[in-house]
């Protein structure tokens, strides 16, 4: 008798799963349950063509045993080379599947009878499959307002020339003429409003220059690398070719590296440099900015880690060798709740009844307060590692 009930239930589920889908099409039905009784859910059906490409996606509203929701569908079209061309905006459909031709004829009604409720991509005639035009959804964008992309090489003309910057062995910045014609790949992009921009890349794919046109005026942002490929300078338009020390300190982004290619000094426009110190495991252990360096007793921000390279402590010290004069700003606890009942974790709301679900996760934290009163936090998780509760001291 029990086996008979199981078979009947299985048959009912099969019939329900196939309901309202087109059985002549390949599809995957996904249901997201909203209640534990499995009677209320969201349905998503993705239909595939004979080549296994998704061409129609149908999303239904909340369904239950008493009513059916409205279906919203999108359509994806491909060209003869299998490339995505037209992506249709979601449209209301009845029934839950429409053949592509029927979908295209009915979709405008969902978008104010706009004749082109889809985005479109146009490709160049080459095996590289690069997009040369992109149209936004709507007839207005299709009437001469695409995002157009052209591919070319650099040259001596004003808009296609690129200054060659290099970093010396001492870390200084030098300009050494222009790149030879045809040695860089240039992408020219024209947006829907006719504004042009250029991106210059070298043969290994690094961006060297981004040029945005403001009418006839070029606004250039240069990216300069050292011989190891590390980004050392970012020169915004305000530099305008003047790479004097004063101008670089005022406008440029500057980075210095050690022999392990770790950034040990960073300088942002108009600020003092920030210094970084690492341990033998390449973990950041100390940092110091200009404000800390200007103090009579120079402060450093220190960082401590556990054996799994997780940050356990962060604060200030006055000596980066002995970490003397320590002021703790952040203290992190992981894996267990053994800290409950110690220090600031003494309130009745800090529970230890966690069933061991904190393994591998941040379970507690102390954050120093501005007024000197730290905030104590505990994080609780379920069996799947999802945070289900957070307790903070007041």
Predicted regions and their residues:
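Bacterial Sec-dependent N-terminal signal peptides
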Residues: 1-24
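Beta-strand elements of repeat-based all-beta scaffolds
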Residues: 20-394
């Amino acid at each position: 008798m029990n086996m008979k009930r199981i078979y009947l239930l299985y048959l009912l589920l099969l019939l329900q799963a196939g309901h309202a889908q087109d059985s002549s099409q390949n599809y995957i039905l996904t249901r997201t349950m909203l209640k534990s009784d499995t009677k209320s859910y969201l349905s998503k059906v993705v239909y595939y063509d004979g080549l296994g490409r998704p061409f129609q996606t149908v999303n239904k509203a909340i369904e239950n045993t008493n009513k059916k929701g409205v279906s919203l569908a999108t359509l994806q079209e491909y060209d003869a080379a299998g490339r995505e061309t037209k992506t249709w905006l979601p449209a209301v459909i009845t029934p839950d599947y429409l053949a592509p031709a029927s979908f295209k004829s009915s979709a405008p009604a969902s978008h104010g009878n706009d004749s082109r409720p889809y985005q479109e991509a146009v490709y160049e005639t080459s095996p590289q499959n690069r997009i040369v035009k992109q149209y936004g959804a709507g007839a207005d964008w299709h009437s001469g307002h695409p995002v157009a992309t052209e591919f070319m090489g650099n040259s001596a003309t004003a808009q296609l020339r690129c200054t060659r910057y290099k970093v010396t062995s001492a870390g200084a910045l030098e300009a050494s003429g222009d790149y030879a014609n045809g040695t860089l790949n240039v992408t020219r992009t024209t947006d829907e409003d006719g504004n042009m921009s250029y991106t210059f890349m070298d043969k290994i794919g690094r961006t060297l220059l981004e040029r945005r046109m403001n009418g006839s005026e070029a606004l250039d942002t240069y990216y300069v690398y050292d011989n190891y490929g590390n980004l050392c300078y970012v020169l915004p338009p305000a530099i305008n070719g003047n790479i004097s020390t004063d101008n670089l300190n005022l406008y440029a982004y500057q980075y210095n590296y050690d022999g392990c290619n770790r950034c040990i000094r960073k300088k942002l426009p108009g600020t003092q440099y920030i210094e970084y110190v690492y341990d033998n495991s390449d973990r950041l252990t100390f940092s110091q900015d200009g404000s800390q360096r200007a103090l009579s007793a120079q402060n450093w921000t220190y960082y401590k880690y556990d054996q799994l390279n997780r940050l356990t402590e962060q604060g200030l010290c006055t000596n980066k060798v002995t970490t003397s004069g320590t002021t703790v700003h952040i203290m992190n606890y992981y894996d267990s709740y053994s800290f409950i009942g110690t220090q600031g974790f003494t309130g009745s709301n800090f529970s230890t009844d966690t069933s061991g679900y904190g393994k591998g996760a941040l379970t507690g934290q102390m954050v120093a307060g501005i007024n000197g009163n730290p905030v104590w936090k505990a994080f609780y998780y379920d069996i799947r590692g999802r945070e289900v509760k957070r307790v903070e001291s007041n």
